[in-house]
């Protein structure tokens, strides 16, 4: 079966001209050679580590740059996108004019013209009926490596008939000198055009912009078809029972869904349709700060040849110091999903989810380590999306900061949050799924809840022990909390017990409850939202 490939004429149709060479869907061995060439300079050059993986630096952008995200406002997006200027809550969907888009596209295509380019054709979505066929164009070898790791790799037979639905042109080396007069945030840009089905990247080298860019597009397209689009990890047990884990970056999605007793469907982005839960991706993008073989053996052993490390400190002998966060706390590794042994094969999808877990990192030390949610509480806490932003996943965030992020992923929502909540709850109700709120953050001791206790809590959810446990109701938040769970320190289940004086918890709880209420006000302009207020905290 011959691979279709791409011609200079096709690139010319995108505005890229006089390309010196096209390296189409390079193999991992070729990428290894390309990204370690001694002639490479700056952020293009990769360093071989003693793990066998290549390490690269992404410069000043060691996380996404949400303030530089734009979507062209036109006939298609005008009345569908959840725009940042509607005053209905924080999101990053700033409108862009067609005129400015044309200018940005010119900057990127000029940057890529006349160069030796890497073109990688991939799928986003494991379900053949709804997947996007995405073509990435870049002049940087390791960026091609990143998308080969993170997206689904087509077979030669699939490549023979590949017709891209979406084009991503990465012009990391170019910047926009006209940003001030165009009313933009900075010289850097991550811009989307849903009519042209294209993403442009300029000024930032961070690999995650390509990954999350396509997630934002799936978040636009799927819910409009009644398919849940979710910022979650997912795994499946021996009996076919599926669990999904929602949570912002760093709350434990990847760690907790990587379980030796269960097969991994995926670690970050999924859909849920009439057939069940399916992965959008073909790889994992795990945080590596303070990574150890003992705490996270699966991720640790996935860091080998073909994995790509970002912004880690590499010692002169090639050793990686995972404890060194001097470049960023948001050190990462991408690797193809088959680097994890315990995965769903051959396609990353399974049946319907029966357990839905909301992960939160409570910086206030108020919420219990686990609680069982009612149907209305499920919608309330999904729309609230309370967590603490953890260090380094966005520029300018270095300490844990309490935040509310709708659907545990407001930064990636292209539609109004209520649309995601409605689709999720509909899917849950159809199969009788149960939701739980799990706090992986802090308590009154000032310390983070141990991974050992959190893992035991997850085990109790997955094996059904939590549903047999006696519960008490935590005041203010009205949460049903188990009194005891196997393998969990009983002293932490009631957060009030972790304080020397319960009045300290009460004061913090009232403060947090007010924040929940204030945040949720923006959803009460609809009857459905107003009906959920009673599921929230009461002071």
From Swiss-Prot:
<feature type="binding site">
    <location>
        <position position="212"/>
    </location>
    <ligand>
        <name>substrate</name>
    </ligand>
</feature>
<keyword id="KW-0312">Gluconeogenesis</keyword>
<dbReference type="Pfam" id="PF01293">
    <property type="entry name" value="PEPCK_ATP"/>
</dbReference>
<dbReference type="InterPro" id="IPR013035">
    <property type="entry name" value="PEP_carboxykinase_C"/>
</dbReference>
<comment type="subunit">
    <text>Monomer.</text>
</comment>
<keyword id="KW-0210">Decarboxylase</keyword>
<dbReference type="GO" id="GO:0005524">
    <property type="term" value="F:ATP binding"/>
</dbReference>
<comment type="function">
    <text>Involved in the gluconeogenesis. Catalyzes the conversion of oxaloacetate (OAA) to phosphoenolpyruvate (PEP) through direct phosphoryl transfer between the nucleoside triphosphate and OAA.</text>
</comment>
<comment type="similarity">
    <text>Belongs to the phosphoenolpyruvate carboxykinase (ATP) family.</text>
</comment>
<feature type="binding site">
    <location>
        <position position="231"/>
    </location>
    <ligand>
        <name>ATP</name>
    </ligand>
</feature>
<dbReference type="InterPro" id="IPR008210">
    <property type="entry name" value="PEP_carboxykinase_N"/>
</dbReference>
<dbReference type="GO" id="GO:0046872">
    <property type="term" value="F:metal ion binding"/>
</dbReference>
<keyword id="KW-0464">Manganese</keyword>
<feature type="binding site">
    <location>
        <position position="332"/>
    </location>
    <ligand>
        <name>substrate</name>
    </ligand>
</feature>
<feature type="binding site">
    <location>
        <position position="212"/>
    </location>
    <ligand>
        <name>Mn(2+)</name>
    </ligand>
</feature>
<feature type="binding site">
    <location>
        <position position="296"/>
    </location>
    <ligand>
        <name>ATP</name>
    </ligand>
</feature>
<keyword id="KW-0479">Metal-binding</keyword>
<keyword id="KW-0963">Cytoplasm</keyword>
<feature type="binding site">
    <location>
        <begin position="448"/>
        <end position="449"/>
    </location>
    <ligand>
        <name>ATP</name>
    </ligand>
</feature>
<keyword id="KW-0547">Nucleotide-binding</keyword>
<feature type="binding site">
    <location>
        <position position="64"/>
    </location>
    <ligand>
        <name>substrate</name>
    </ligand>
</feature>
<feature type="binding site">
    <location>
        <position position="206"/>
    </location>
    <ligand>
        <name>substrate</name>
    </ligand>
</feature>
<feature type="binding site">
    <location>
        <position position="332"/>
    </location>
    <ligand>
        <name>ATP</name>
    </ligand>
</feature>
<comment type="pathway">
    <text>Carbohydrate biosynthesis; gluconeogenesis.</text>
</comment>
<feature type="binding site">
    <location>
        <position position="212"/>
    </location>
    <ligand>
        <name>ATP</name>
    </ligand>
</feature>
<protein>
    <recommendedName>
        <fullName>Phosphoenolpyruvate carboxykinase (ATP)</fullName>
        <ecNumber>4.1.1.49</ecNumber>
    </recommendedName>
</protein>
<dbReference type="GO" id="GO:0004612">
    <property type="term" value="F:phosphoenolpyruvate carboxykinase (ATP) activity"/>
</dbReference>
<feature type="binding site">
    <location>
        <begin position="247"/>
        <end position="255"/>
    </location>
    <ligand>
        <name>ATP</name>
    </ligand>
</feature>
<dbReference type="InterPro" id="IPR001272">
    <property type="entry name" value="PEP_carboxykinase_ATP"/>
</dbReference>
<feature type="binding site">
    <location>
        <position position="268"/>
    </location>
    <ligand>
        <name>Mn(2+)</name>
    </ligand>
</feature>
<dbReference type="GO" id="GO:0006094">
    <property type="term" value="P:gluconeogenesis"/>
</dbReference>
<dbReference type="GO" id="GO:0005829">
    <property type="term" value="C:cytosol"/>
</dbReference>
<feature type="binding site">
    <location>
        <position position="231"/>
    </location>
    <ligand>
        <name>Mn(2+)</name>
    </ligand>
</feature>
<dbReference type="InterPro" id="IPR015994">
    <property type="entry name" value="PEPCK_ATP_CS"/>
</dbReference>
<feature type="binding site">
    <location>
        <position position="454"/>
    </location>
    <ligand>
        <name>ATP</name>
    </ligand>
</feature>
<keyword id="KW-0067">ATP-binding</keyword>
<keyword id="KW-0456">Lyase</keyword>
